[in-house]
Curated annotation (Swiss-Prot):
Enzyme class: transferase
InterPro entries to which the protein is assigned, alphabetical: Glyco_transf_54, MGAT4_A/B/C_C
Gene name per UniProt: MGAT4C
Co-factor(s): a divalent metal cation
Cytoplasmic face of the membrane: 1-23
Tissue-wise expression: Expressed in heart, adrenal gland, testis, liver, brain and fetal brain. Not expressed in pancreas.
Descriptive protein name: Alpha-1,3-mannosyl-glycoprotein 4-beta-N-acetylglucosaminyltransferase C
Family: Belongs to the glycosyltransferase 54 family.
Record's keyword annotation contains Transmembrane: yes
Highest taxon of source: Eukaryota
Transferase in keyword set: yes
Membrane topology note: Single-pass type II membrane protein
GO molecular function, one term: metal ion binding
Keywords associated with the record: Glycoprotein, Glycosyltransferase, Golgi apparatus, Membrane, Metal-binding, Signal-anchor, Transferase, Transmembrane, Transmembrane helix
Length: 478
């Protein structure tokens, strides 16, 4: 952590550097932005991951030898402040109140295909009337071709006029004059020059979009312009956010593809916008998002399944090349995140490394993994308070390890929690049923069980030679 007198000394040095001749201006700016990045991203958090430190060190060593950087970096004196851009409102009515979630899209002219209208349609059609009150959609038409922009605005206003009037849909454009130079950039990763230009501009497109959306809502989710949404995705997102109350997070992921479905606190958007703008020519946007998450001290990916958003475009926005990427975790209908009420979990199975019991109960993409279980081994969930359960679903094994399932087991529910020297546990259990092909699912549990449930346990009925993965335990309460 920087001390005040150290900061003062640094600023005195920087102030003296301003007196250097003009040819030193760019180098000074290079030093300044690296200093500011550390100040803003490091001073508030306890550590920076080594990989991200290396990124900063490598970037800081690049020779800043062009006047174009002056324009790019001149507004970076405050990473929490807005980037100075005057936007053009192509279709919008004033936002009367702050919403819960802003959905941001950036779109450019494609050589083949156009999926933007279908994406906007999916957002609105997959949302209920109540959900529509809590969202705003911001579309950044980022292409410099004014004829294309005019045509797209006409199509959008014709199809979604009522959403524009209601303040749910805004179409904006950041003028070309605010963009840094996009030609003659470094060819990192030996990318061809046109690809470097494409991905570098895309980073700036998103930086300006994030900058605009910083004060429109409490949360922000990033989409591409060729995506379809799961039914009631907002309700699912709200449920996840509520379940993480009190937990530190920077990025939540609701898709495993690129930067589709990345969710942020809106108060982080200014820093993320500055970050993308600073390193716009270094690497693709999704890589930068990963580094940003690490710099703000979220070490691990927090991704939820099933995915809420699916890539539907067939042709890429880069050169119109074929792009058949699909998220096989996507479920379009009735996405229902379980309640999974607070509970303690334990097992007497031999746990492998850090794949502990609690990971099977999390809605994050992780699981419990144990060495071969024996007859009588148990995996127990003790709820903080007795609950009424509507539905239970337990899945074992994974795609990669399809034989690491529970081959012989049953699921029991219990009552009458008794204290013990080691942990709380129930004194009596009632068997609900057996596992079939490694899975257990039962609806209407509350109609079959005459008591409030204090415990739930997975009971191994026969020794197996295979290891056991419990991929997910899902509980819905009434």
């Amino acid at each position: 952590m920087f001390k005040f007198h150290q900061m003062k000394h640094i600023f005195e040095i920087l102030d003296k550097m301003r007196c250097l001749r003009k040819r030193s201006t760019v180098s000074f700016l290079g030093v300044l932005v690296i200093f500011l990045l550390f100040m803003n991203l490091y001073i508030e958090d306890s550590y920076v991951l080594e990989g991200d430190k290396q990124l900063i060190r490598e970037t800081s060593t690049h020779q800043l030898n062009s006047e174009r950087y002056v324009h790019t970096f001149k507004d970076l004196s405050n990473f929490s402040g807005a980037i100075n851009v005057t936007y053009r409102y192509l279709a919008a009515t004033p936002l009367q109140r702050k919403r819960y979630l802003t959905i941001g899209l950036s779109s450019v002219k494609r050589k083949k295909g156009n999926y933007l209208l279908e994406t906007i349609k999916s957002i609105f059609e997959q949302s209920s009337y109540e959900e529509l009150k809590e969202i705003s959609v911001v579309v950044h038409l980022a292409d410099f071709n004014s004829s294309w922009r005019d045509a797209m605005v006409q199509d959008i206003t014709q199809k979604f006029a009522h959403h524009i009037i209601a303040g749910r849909l805004m179409v904006i454009h950041a003028p070309e004059e605010y963009y840094p130079i996009l030609d003659g950039l470094k060819r990192n990763y030996n990318d061809p020059e046109d690809r470097v230009k494409f991905r570098s501009k895309q980073n700036v497109d998103y930086a300006f979009l994030l900058n605009f959306c910083a004060n429109t809502s409490d949360y922000y989710v990033m989409l591409e312009d060729d995506v379809r949404c799961s039914k009631n995705f907002l309700t699912a997102i709200k449920k996840v956010i509520a379940s993480l109350e009190g937990t530190y997070w920077v990025t939540l992921e609701f898709s495993k593809l690129g930067y589709i479905g990345k969710l942020y606190h809106s108060h982080d958007l200014p820093r993320l916008a500055h970050f993308l703008l600073m390193f716009y020519q270094e690497m693709p946007c999704d890589w930068l998002l990963t580094h940003f998450r690490g710099l703000l001290a979220q070490k691990n990916v927090i991704r939820f399944k099933p995915s809420l958003f699916q890539h539907m475009g067939y042709y890429s926005s880069y050169k119109g090349t074929e792009n058949k990427l699909k998220d096989d975790d996507f479920e379009e209908e009735s996405f229902d995140i379980p309640d999974n009420p607070p509970a303690s979990l334990y097992t007497n199975m031999n746990v492998f490394e850090n794949y502990e019991a609690s990971k099977a109960y999390s809605s994050v993409d992780e699981y419990f993994w144990g060495k071969p279980p024996s007859t009588g081994d148990v995996f127990v969930i003790v709820f903080e308070n007795p609950i009424i359960i509507k539905k239970i679903k337990v899945n074992t094994g994974t795609e990669d390890r399809q034989n690491d399932i529970l081959h012989h087991g049953a699921l029991d529910v219990g009552e009458n929690v008794m204290p013990s020297k080691q942990r709380r546990q129930c004194s009596t259990y009632l068997r609900l049923g057996e596992f079939k092909n490694g899975n257990f699912e039962m609806s209407g549990v509350n109609q079959k069980i005459p008591f409030d449930i204090h415990c739930m346990r997975i009971y191994v009925t026969k020794t197996q030679k295979e290891w056991l993965i419990i991929r997910s335990i899902s509980i819905w309460t009434s």
